[in-house]
Structure formats: structure tokens, C-alpha cells
Swiss-Prot record:
UniProt xrefs under InterPro entries: Ntn_hydrolases_N (IPR029055), Pept_T1A_Psome_bsu_arc (IPR019983), Pept_T1A_subB (IPR000243), Proteasome_bsu_CS (IPR016050), Proteasome_sua/b (IPR001353), Proteasome_suB-type (IPR023333)
Species of provenance: Hyperthermus butylicus (strain DSM 5456 / JCM 9403 / PLM1-5)
Enzymatic class: hydrolase
GO molecular function: threonine-type endopeptidase activity
Family designation: Belongs to the peptidase T1B family.
Catalyzed reactions per annotation: Cleavage of peptide bonds with very broad specificity
Prodomain positions: 1-15
Main location: cytoplasm
Biological process according to GO: proteasomal protein catabolic process
Name used for this protein in its record: Proteasome subunit beta 2
Amino acid sequence: MLHHPGTGQLRALKGTTTVGIVFRDFVVLAADRRATAGYFVAHKRTKKIIKITDYMAMTTAGLVADAQMLAEWLANHTHYYEIVNKRRMSIHAAAQYLSIILHSAKFYPYIVQLLLGGYDTQPRLYNIDWFGSVTEEKYVATGSGSPTAIGVIEDQYSPNLSMEEAVELAKRAVASSIRRDTFTGNGVDVVVIGKDFYREYSFELKDILKTK
């Protein structure tokens, strides 16, 4: 959100829907593909889930350039950490790294809302806002379609869902926003991260709209 000059009101800068959900043995991230500039559909196949490592990924909402730069910095930092320390960086440490960058730029902020999900000793999910605030979550949704998506997740969430059921829940949550939110659309991408795997799924709009 940004201050709208001359009105004293807040307005949404960008539109999207991203979700993150933690299950017993894995974490699921999902996002739509539509990129907008105001009410104009700027791109129909935008990748909003960025792979950081084989055990970590980040969803993005906000300004594309800011999100891409932060993802590149994080990927480079985690790679350097692994070379120096001969072990993986924890998801919490990666979230704190992003938090430091965002907080240090709070007077000239990066316009982003990030979800960082991955697996270290267990599946983890962090919600990071543009001022650097970090919260660990079991499930969360961001973007203009988040009010619709979070309702679907809260209604059907269980930590013990199978992977197939978990992917279906994430897809259904974003699909609900596609139906209701002008700024969300054009398909859904889903990533599942577990102890020894990183899996990607893509769903086309025509198939998503069949989802109840």
C-alpha cells in the first residue's frame, strides 16, 4: 500500500495473489501469473515464485524490479554462505537477511511483500513486508486477492494433507482470487519443497476455472 497524494488515503500499488502453506513434511508456495500496470494487463505469464536454492523459494508481490533484485541478492548470499560454511543456510537466517536489507531502506523502501518458504530441519514459511517485519506463519496470503484466498485456506487447511491434496488446496485458493480479483489471473504456479525435493507445477486458466 502507498499514500495517495492529496487524499490522505491508502491505495493498492500492485495486484497479485500469492499463498504459502506449511504442512507436516513440506511447504507449498503458489501464485498467479498476471502482471498489471494500473488496470492494464502488462504480462500474462509472469513468474512470481523465484527459486533461491534447491531447498528455498520466494514469492513476490509489488514492484517487479525490486523483487527480482532482492531475490538475486538472496540467491548470491545463500550460495556464498554454503561455500564458506559447508552447510545450508537456515530459512530463518535467509528471512533475517532480507529483513535487514528492507529495514535499512525503510526511508526509500523496496515496494515488495515477500513470502519465503523452504525446508531446513523442518518446513518453514516467513512473511516479510517492505519495512523488514518478519513473521513465521503456518499459512498466509499476500496481494490484492489475499482476502479471498486466505478464506479458502482457513476453511480447508490441515497440516496432515497429502502432497496432492496440498497442491490442490493452494491452487484452489489462488483460483478463488482469479474469479474475484481483477488483478489476479492467467494461471497458477505451485512449488512444493520438502527435505529432499523441489517440485514445480503449472496450471492453465482453462483448467483452473473448472476448480470448485
